[in-house]
């Protein structure tokens, strides 16, 4: 027999984050979720190609992106913000070669790093 106990948390009266920063963190949160999806697509490609080492590399990236997203989720909630979930666009699923996958992953990482830098600039 399992007993479920619900704990009601009182809504925060004071938001400890600006609307602009909340919106920017939510945007980045959703980019991290897309990145997770994108790298999962890349892992799937390598699985289909029989390249399990490369597949595993991208599965590790999948977990890392989820970890980043969840840090933002917790931060927004701790600061009285509200997490918004946007639709996740379908990532590219067909690749010409392993080299193309790594080139795309590198370009994507540069993009996401730039977004993080912009977020830091906004926060300070």
What is each PLM-predicted segment?
Residues 1-124:
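Iron-associated oxidoreductase/ferritin-like identity signal
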């Amino acid at each position: 027999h399992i007993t479920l106990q619900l704990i009601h948390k009182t809504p925060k009266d004071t938001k400890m984050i600006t609307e602009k920063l909340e919106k920017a963190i939510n945007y980045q949160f959703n980019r991290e979720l897309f990145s997770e999806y994108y790298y999962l697509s890349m892992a799937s490609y390598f699985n289909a190609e029989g390249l399990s080492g490369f597949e595993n590399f991208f599965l590790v990236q999948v977990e890392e992106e989820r970890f980043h997203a969840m840090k933002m989720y917790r931060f927004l909630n701790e600061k009285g913000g509200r997490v918004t979930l946007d639709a996740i666009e379908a990532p590219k699923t067909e690749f010409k070669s392993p080299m193309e996958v790594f080139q795309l992953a590198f370009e994507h990482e540069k993009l996401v790093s730039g977004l993080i830098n912009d977020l830091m600039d906004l926060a300070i």
